[in-house]
A protein has these predicted regions:
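Conformationally flexible catalytic loops at phosphate/diphosphate-handling active centers
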Residues: 128-204
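Conserved small/polar residues in nucleotide/adenosyl-binding loops
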Residues: 267-272
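Core nucleotide-handling region used for phosphoryl-transfer chemistry
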Residues: 229-255
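Glycine-rich beta-alpha junction loops
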Residues: 82-83, 137-142, 217-219, 265
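Long hydrophobic segments that form regular secondary structure
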Residues: 209-212, 216-225
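Thiamine diphosphate
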Residues: 1-111, 118, 137-139, 232
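Structural motif
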Residues: 1, 214-218, 238-240, 261-264
Length: 272
């Protein structure tokens, strides 16, 4: 459903995708789509599954359990949120699904970043052996721009994991693998703290500021449009989760007031 429909339509109509025999299909529902993509990942291939935010509700069973089984080939779950409900019955925030499943999340702020993040997401997924949730919003999903493209990489060959017991979440397996997932959270936090998509701008740690901004995803673009050279406001850009706690503490310590700009409903994530 919109605003995610256009992604699959573009892939199916793209000449390069056809030339490379990229397999793209519609599924009965989001849970089925999630399971198909997860199966491709188990076989060693990279897979992308796209849905809108309310589709995450339907896919939740397979989505949450995929974090416990883990992945083989890189798996990216793209959730297209719809703030202000342009074509949806609610405006839920899919980032909470990523937090609930305890997996990495990415939120691009521009078309170029969305392009670059996809390769980064697959690499991160294969490194951590976890699915990666990428959140986009309507204003980004319904936009186009020229981007600087990277070289085309060789596709993953079929390489199924020969040890398959962990794919079956009987309690004996699930308990152990859930603990493994909990232990991975430090690696997720480390990846977020070192992420090229989370960074501070215009903040000198030796000075105190009256005002600072934390901008998430496309909110960063809105801040930069409103900013001028005379403002001198420090900005923390956040596009990878878990939240970069150390950078947030720096902002809180150095700024009297901190404004958070994000495309989100009334609830919000907190750094403790």
């Amino acid at each position: 459903g919109t605003p995610s429909t256009e992604i699959t339509e573009f892939i199916q109509n793209n000449p390069l995708a056809k030339e490379r025999k990229l397999h793209s299909t519609w599924c009965t529902n989001e849970k089925t789509a999630m399971e198909v993509a997860l199966g491709m990942s188990y076989a060693g291939k990279r897979a992308l599954v796209c849905m809108k935010h309310v589709g995450m509700n339907v896919a939740a069973d397979a989505f949450v359990n995929s974090a416990i089984t883990g992945v083989n080939g890189g798996l990216v779950v793209l959730a297209a949120d719809d703030p202000s409900m342009h074509s949806s019955q609610n405006e839920q925030d899919s980032r909470f699904y990523g937090k609930f499943a305890m997996i990495p999340m990415l939120e691009p702020s521009s078309q170029q970043e969305a392009y670059d993040m996809m390769d980064y997401a697959y690499t991160l997924s294969e490194k951590l052996k976890l699915p990666v949730l990428m959140r986009v919003v309507t204003r980004l999903a319904h936009s186009r721009a020229g981007v600087e493209v990277a070289d085309i990489r060789e596709e993953n060959q079929l390489n199924p994991d020969h040890e398959r017991a962990h794919w079956v979440l009987l309690p004996g397996n699930a308990r152990k693998q859930y603990l493994d997932l909990v232990k991975k959270q430090e690696k997720l936090e480390e990846a977020s703290s070192k992420s090229p998509y989370n960074y501070l701008e215009g903040l000198n740690p030796e000075y105190d500021y009256e005002f600072g901004v934390i901008a998430c995803g496309i909110g960063y673009n809105y801040v930069k449009e409103a900013d001028t050279d005379s403002c001198h406001i420090p900005v923390l850009k956040v596009s990878q989760y878990p939240l970069p706690a150390e950078e947030i503490r720096t902002m809180a310590d150095r700024c009297g007031y901190v404004l958070v700009v994000e495309a989100v409903s009334y609830t919000h994530l907190r750094a403790h």
